[in-house]
Amino acid sequence: MDKKVLIKRFSEAIEKGNAAIFAGAGLSMSQGYVSWPELLNDPATEIGLDSKKETDLVTLAQYYKNENGGSRGILNQILMDNFGEELEISENHRILASLPIETYWTTNYDHLIEKSIREAYKNPQVKKNYTQLATTNPNVDTIVYKMHGDIDDVSSTVITRDDYEKYDDDSYALFKETLKGDLLTKTFLFLGFSFTDPNLERILSDIRWVLRENQRPHYCIMRKILKENFVDSEDFFDQERYNYELTKRRLQINDLSRFSINVVEVDDYSEITDILKSIRKKYLRKTIFISGSAVDYTPFTSESKGLKFVEKLAYRLSESGYRIVSGYGLGIGNSIVSGVLKQRRNLRKNNIQDVLSLRPLPLDMPHEWRRYRENIIAESGISIFVFGNKLESGEIVTADGMIEEFELSVQNENIVVPIGFTKGASKVLFDKIQENFSDYFDDSLKSKFQALEKLDTEGEVDKKVEQIVSLINSIQED
């Protein structure tokens, strides 16, 4: 599957509020936690086996438990030794936590997912056993389902065949039914997952049996089988084993398609980070930050005509499916709200929370303004600048706050679109982009951008609004 398709489809799922993540061991290994073969290396050696040669590691853990008189005490200690330490979260965790993803499933015992969510100033609810499934915290932002338990309750973790068989009990079956429900109603992205978990395989089979070809599409990112991984210390390349693993991967990808899981293969794990960044960028570009302030509405001949332009712009952006965030700038804030409200009213929808976010600056706390601006802009992927003037000592001057918002937008990797014909700071910023256009836009968009420099007559306001929307839509296709 082409990664551009994955980026497009999963960002759309986030926008619709039905995206979910399924995290396997690979998501944590980059930070220093061990893989299953590494975890069971010493136990396997003790009972005369080699964890690197075993594919059924659940049974290997069961064998070790059996050889220790049916006690899993030593296994519990091995888990504590390997997962008890709190490690730093990865960039991938941070990217995911920054997105409005409300559901995580994981087989990992560590705390990296919930830790990253808290660092993003969100409140996760962790459900690590079946007794917690029926309760939901009303103030929760994200639910993290830990279907194999948590290192803080090591004796309840799932690692042996005995533990997996508990999922056939009525109590543990609730976890399976909850996951089935999410797989039916949400779009999952599987990360760091090998698809060797017997519970998940049975759940996917149950869904496939019921829905047949009507299953919901899901996505997975896997690293390619690379030749360099089959070269030993003496530079001997094991062609036979390499070909075997290639064939096995091809068959696995084909098998996953039965469950409507589409696989994207990458050459290097760093590409996963790039894909997640692209997903975030694609999602954020559906949210537009409108920066502006005005006491003078030149080139318009009256304040009402200038405000009408802002209202029409907000209306058309909302109508085109964009969410708007604004600091409720001086002289334009009401018009932004009015434009969005009118568009929603035409759709017979009164709720505007999902399409408009207002974050006025605390006027009595100027020392906090930069942080407020950073937080507002971080919600968006495109910044539009209109007008940009204010009164200072009785004179109309350029709004320096808009210049700062431009700089913060660039820092946030936003696409920046100053509407040059509205003068003030917007014209200053428009000229700045003109000087080094390729630093901000693809050259193919130059004519569309330059069309925003002048307003010949007030009668062409509707035309200018359409030109702005057309430029924004073209950016989405980039």
From Swiss-Prot:
SUPFAM superfamilies to which the protein is assigned, alphabetical: DHS-like NAD/FAD-binding domain
Domain named Deacetylase sirtuin-type: residues: 1-287
Catalytic reaction annotation: NAD(+) + H2O = ADP-D-ribose + nicotinamide + H(+)
Keywords: Antiviral defense, Hydrolase, NAD, Nucleotide-binding
Outcome following mutation: residue 293 to A: No change in NADase activity
Result, substituting residue 390 to A: Slower NADase activation by 3'cADPR
Active-site feature positions: 148 (proton acceptor)
Binding site for NAD(+): 19, 110, 148
Any GO MF annotation of the entry: nucleotide binding
Regulation: Activated by 3'cADPR.
Its biological purpose: NAD(+) hydrolyzing component (NADase) of the Thoeris antiviral defense system, composed of ThsA and ThsB (maybe AS248_15445). Activated by 3' cyclic ADP-D-ribose (3'cADPR) but not its isomers 2'cADPR, cADPR and very weakly by ADPR; binds 3'cADPR better than 2'cADPR. Upon activation binds and hydrolyzes NAD(+), leading to cell death and inhibition of phage replication.
Domains as described in the record: Has an N-terminal sirtuin-like domain (SIR2, residues 1-287) and a C-terminal SLOG (STALD)-like domain (residues 288-478). The SIR2 domain probably has NAD(+) hydrolase activity. The SLOG domain binds 3'cADPR; binding alters the protein conformation, allowing NAD(+) to access the active site.
The protein's name in its UniProt record: NAD(+) hydrolase ThsA
UniProt organism field: Enterococcus faecium (Streptococcus faecium)
